Amino acid sequence: MAEVTLTNVRKNYNPDLLKDTLRNINLYIKDGEFIVFVGPSGCGKSTLLRMIAGLEDITDGVLKIGDKVMNDVPPVDRGVGMVFQSYALYPHMNVRQNMEFGLKLKKFDKDTIEKRVNNAAQILGLDALMDRKPKALSGGQRQRVAIGRSIVQQPDVFLFDEPLSNLDAALRVKMRIEIAKLHKELNSTIIYVTHDQVEAMTLADKIVVLSPLKESAETNLEQFGSPLELYHNPTNKFVAGFIGSPKMNFLKGQLIEIGEETCKVKLNTGDVITACVDARRASVGDKVELGIRPEHLVPVEHQDSKSRLSGMVQVAEHLGAESFVYLDVDGEDFTVKAASEIPVDTGDSLEVGIPAEACYLFDAQEKAFKRTARYNRT
């Protein structure tokens, strides 16, 4: 296994246009960490993974795996194993032959090949499927074979490029568990790309949040940290809105009172909200944006909250264990997630409490103010 270091890495597909895809990417990935690259389409997450694999050139900057600079090292010599979105199995070969193939090309002896393949099959639960061809396997089984083909190479770093996106919802959940167990079994360095932030939150030791690069931006690496760090303390509105499901609600307003650990915001709706936020770097009258997660909102009859607002119900979804209510709050979409059924119908007015400890606040440049408390819903 190995650590991975990226220093001032940049990617530009067309230097004549002076438009970078990735800029000033600086990351240090520890040996054995599970790192997830996440972001919307066009943010460069798969490009960054392919640069680590050696499938894309690095325009500027330095990539190290262990203590060796890899910029000009061919993919086959980088010590990485890659699993793609497509399974890419040989249809005329059975499971065992697919897993053996790469080792045979590298001229490993028969005993080594058999030992590695049998070990990978045991880890992945493929023992009973070794004589089957890909057409006789389910999607999840095919993906396990693709992972097994990488395991037998014993790479220093595993690279996963959206490996679950071709699977249905139930199978994605099952395979997430399998990949998490695999990481614990191998204690390996894994770099994993996904557009699904739920996958990122459930699998990662740390998450890299990337955004589509703005021309004037220094970098499109928005934040690098643990899942809970990104959830509770996002550095900006982009990260706050991307991490968490359903997405965070945002409402515009202005600061009307600033204290050491709290502030008051008058929303454009006219409601005044108290937030446990240190806003002392701003001034009274500054325009801000309040953020509140759907799961932190509670109908006022269940919440003794001084801060509250109301909206008109557009849709109510009752799922048994939880409910989602979609409100129109002064023309803005607003989502409430509750742990039980909320007795409302389309067209009703619903008033919700906003706990001060649950508030996030962002300035006019969308940078987050420091939160001074963490909300614990009881």
Q: What is each stretch, according to the model?
A:
Residues 1-6, 12-24, 73-74, 107:
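A short, flexible loop at the N-terminus of ABC-type nucleotide-binding domains that lies
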Residues 61-69:
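Conserved ABC transporter NBD signature motif
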Residues 53:
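Helix-to-loop junction immediately C-terminal to a conserved catalytic motif
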Residues 262-315, 333, 343-378:
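Glycine/charge-rich catalytic "coupling/switch" loops of P-loop NTPases
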Residues 59-62, 112, 252:
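Conserved coupling/switch loops of ABC nucleotide-binding domains, chiefly the family-specific signature
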Residues 38-40:
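The feature captures the beta-strand-to-loop junction immediately N-terminal to the Walker
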Residues 5, 28, 64, 351-353:
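ABC ATPase nucleotide-binding domain
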Residues 78-79, 85-236:
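ABC ATPase nucleotide-binding domains
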